[in-house]
């Protein structure tokens, strides 16, 4: 698409007008985005909107930091970091665990800031308070309430897998986190077949199957690889028979399969199925 645009611009007699039009549209768009950022920034400062990723402080702050970093707006990076420091330090054990409106989302946000090089400090200490709350809350989930808490457990497991994958915890904690992750996968896996039967609307992150596949992919390298390989072999016929109706769900599933195929030697049918999920379209 960029080459087509360049050919139009550089061969057009009105290239100056085109340049000005493109620049004007970009300027208007950026100004509009910055107006929204300012409104959201003052909203989270004024109100107790929660410090979470979805409609909360962490979500606003992460976007401000991303925008400032990518468009050389240092002010937005600094303001985003400042509101995280002010608003995201008052977490309680009663808060939810999920990504959108829970502690896992905050922890993943901090992990992203560290991996992106935006915060230059060890994050094990920063995340230890959140981790303590997560461990305590998971330990209180009974076998009878596993089904009700499946989404939260799936989010927690993905978070722990990423902590281990990116070595963001101390060597002493590695063994504890690895055992905790193995326990979570053993909790979640029996409900795998229910995940296959449920396609959420309108789709996207709430679709559990891609998250489960991503969890398996991210969990390799933690002393229970043989268990993960057996899980892949067991679920292969069922996963390769899935064709979600919603486009967002098909793309999410295809992406998770490709991530797994990139790191593990899988039957060729996995890659073929991922391609089919992307290429074949249905009305929605």
Model-flagged regions — what are they?
Residues 1-23:
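N-terminal amphipathic/basic-hydrophobic helices that include classical n-h-c signal peptides
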Residues 14, 20-284:
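Glycan-recognition and catalytic cores of secretory/periplasmic carbohydrate-active enzymes
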């Amino acid at each position: 698409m960029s080459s087509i645009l360049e050919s139009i611009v550089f061969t057009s007699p009105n290239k100056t007008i085109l340049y000005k039009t493109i620049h004007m549209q970009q300027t208007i768009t950026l100004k509009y985005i910055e107006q929204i950022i300012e409104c959201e920034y003052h909203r989270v400062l004024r109100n107790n909107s929660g410090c979470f990723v979805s409609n909360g402080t962490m979500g606003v702050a992460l976007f401000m930091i991303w925008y400032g970093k990518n468009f050389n707006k240092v002010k937005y990076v600094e303001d985003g970091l400042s509101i995280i420091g002010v608003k995201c330090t008052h977490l309680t054990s009663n808060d939810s665990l999920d990504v959108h409106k829970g502690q896992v989302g905050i922890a993943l946000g901090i992990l992203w800031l560290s991996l992106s090089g935006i915060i230059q400090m060890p994050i094990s200490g920063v995340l230890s308070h959140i981790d303590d709350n997560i461990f305590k809350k998971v330990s209180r989930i009974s076998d009878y309430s596993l089904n009700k808490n499946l989404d939260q457990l799936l989010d927690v497991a993905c978070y722990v897998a990423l902590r281990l994958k990116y070595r963001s915890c101390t060597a002493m904690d590695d063994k504890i986190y690895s055992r905790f992750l193995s326990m979570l996968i053993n909790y979640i896996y029996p409900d795998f077949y229910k995940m296959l039967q449920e396609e959420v609307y309108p789709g996207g992150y709430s679709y559990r199957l891609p998250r489960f596949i991503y969890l398996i992919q991210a969990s390799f390298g933690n002393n229970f690889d043989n268990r993960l390989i057996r899980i892949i072999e067991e679920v292969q016929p069922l996963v390769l028979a899935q064709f979600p109706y919603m486009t967002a769900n098909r793309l999410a599933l295809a992406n998770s399969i490709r991530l797994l195929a990139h790191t593990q030697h899988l039957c060729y049918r996995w890659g073929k199925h991922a391609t089919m999920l992307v290429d074949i379209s249905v009305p929605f």
